[in-house]
Amino acid sequence: DSLHVGHFMTLVLMKRLQMAGNKPIALIGGGTGMIGDPSGRSDMRSMMTNEIIDHNCECFKKQMSKFIHFGEEANDAKMRNNADWLRNLDFMEFMREVGVHFNVANMLRARAYENRMAREGGLTFFEMSYMILQGYDFYRLYKDEGCNLEFGGDDQWSNMLAGTDLIRKKTGKDDAYAMT
């Protein structure tokens, strides 16, 4: 229920972009939090209840508000929660519309999965789907909000590229970018 030092640079960048007249969109993972990011992990994350995830999301927004201004004005930051589009997703429709654009061989080469694949426990489909969901998040922000830049930690690089690739494949446009 608390941001960590790894979030600081992203928040500083969001603040600087906001000061320059841009409208930052902070995405919180009320949907992906149900799975947990396997990046940098040697074991599977424990699953949290919806109540804990929702509580954490509220805490994150409160903490982020100390850095960036949320509101309704032109360049006020906006908070989006991926639970809005992930929690009630139709699995078969999602696989037909989104899953078809992901190559498993390419996904397995991602840094986030290399160590896990080398271990005895391997990687579950549950965890592997995180990359697809994060890529879909960027696609939704691109489509719904006009967001064309995603930035995050270097441990998220493969997941962010999954988003730019999905946007290119679904829209035919090459104007979505990722930055660490």
Cite the ranges covered by each PLM segment:
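NTP-dependent nucleotidyl-transfer catalytic core
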Residues: 1-177
